[in-house]
Amino acid sequence: MNITFIGFGEAGGILAQDLQAQGNAVTVWDRKALVAETLPALQQKAQQGRVRLAASLADALQDATLVFSTVTASQALNVVQQAAALLQNGQHFLDLNSVAPHTKRAAAEVIHAAGASYIDVAVMAPVPPKRLATPLLIGGAQAERVKPLLHQLGLNSRLLGSEVGEASAIKMCRSVMIKGLEALTTECLSAARQYGVEQAVLDSLHASFPSLGWNDQLPHYLISRVAEHGQRRAEEMQEVVKTLQDVKVPADMSAAIVATQQGLVDALNARALRYQQLTPFIWQETLDKIYPPQ
């Protein structure tokens, strides 16, 4: 099967590599190819994954049966508008980006007007651990037709129905909790560390929620997700804010999550720290670089 990925970051890179390993013809396109400074690393990544790096978006979309969009939330609609002028009848555009239902519906209108089909896809867990087995929710007028193709590829998809936006709504509402827990942990332990009471706080959390791992790897994992992906998560949470506002639900917590996720990234950038310099990730050491112990 001819498959194209627009966006060759973490999720797109993993899925593209695994699908290529199955014998599919996988092509990738990323706007980093347009920047001289980032092109060599992109070429190396494509070579390592044994996928074809397209010369242009038009080149990437030609002859593709399935087109997966795995860009950032802020670029999701721009990609739709650029791709729509190049898509043809019979092609399926699968939008895996974490954006508001309203954004997905607007994207669907653009793709449908171009004659292609639009599939709303919600990625319901981090991609690295389960890779192709990562749970996906799919919806859209052609979702029932596309599901067998995804099953053939080994993707773990669940059909919701023909309505665009339902899968996205589930993902957006879930993100309030998931990204919120990351932000709460970052803020909580940043302060606790400054007061020298972090172990007592973690002991108390473990006593209240003994099955979650507060006394083990959970704090490292939650804060590492912000350190590594806070920029993208902040953009996604801005879409969550829109999701809530569209149905007149106050988005105070979601707006605060945006600030906390982005805040940690900004603090690391201000100190010229990159996530690769922080691995293996130990939350205490990372926060000490931002907030020197009192």
Task: Show which residues each predicted segment covers.
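NAD(P)+-binding Rossmann beta1-loop-alpha1 motif at the extreme N-terminus of oxidoreductases
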Residues: 1-62, 87-90
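The conserved SAM/SAH-binding core of class I Rossmann-like methyltransferase domains
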Residues: 6, 29, 69-70, 121
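Hydrophobic beta-strand scaffold residues
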Residues: 26, 53, 117-118, 157, ...
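Rossmann-fold NAD(P) dinucleotide-binding segment
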Residues: 57-118
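Rossmann-fold dinucleotide-binding core
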Residues: 99, 105-179
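Helical "substrate-binding/catalytic lid" subdomain
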Residues: 170-279
